[in-house]
From Swiss-Prot:
Protein's name in the database: Alpha-like toxin CsEv5
Organism: Centruroides sculpturatus (Arizona bark scorpion)
Keyword Disulfide bond found: yes
Keywords, alphabetical: Disulfide bond, Ion channel impairing toxin, Neurotoxin, Secreted, Toxin, Voltage-gated sodium channel impairing toxin
Entry superkingdom: Eukaryota
Disulfide-bonded cysteines: 11-59, 15-35, 21-40, 25-42
Function: Binds voltage-independently sodium channels (Nav) and inhibits the inactivation of the activated channels, thereby blocking neuronal transmission. Is highly toxic to insects and barely toxic to mammals. As it does not compete with the classical alpha-toxin AaH2, this toxin is considered as an alpha-like toxin.
Coiled-coil intervals, chain numbering: none
GO molecular function: sodium channel inhibitor activity; toxin activity
Length: 59
């Protein structure tokens, strides 16, 4: 699945550079990622990966 991965507090990973996000996403077993709207966006995450949900976002 695709989406904005979250940290242990449930917050999106903030970013300014695409290479940072690509590395962070790959560590979460995604195919890759990029920085979009100041947050990391991952593509190809496992289905069980936790991603940001605007309905429950508390950050």
């Amino acid at each position: 699945k695709d989406g904005y991965p979250v940290d242990s507090k449930g917050c999106k990973l903030s970013c300014v550079a695409n290479n940072y996000c690509d590395n962070q996403c790959k560590m979460k077993k995604a195919s890759g990622g990029h920085c979009y709207a100041m947050s990391c966006y991952c593509e190809g995450l496992p289905e069980n990966a936790k991603v940001s949900d605007s309905a429950t976002n508390i950050c």
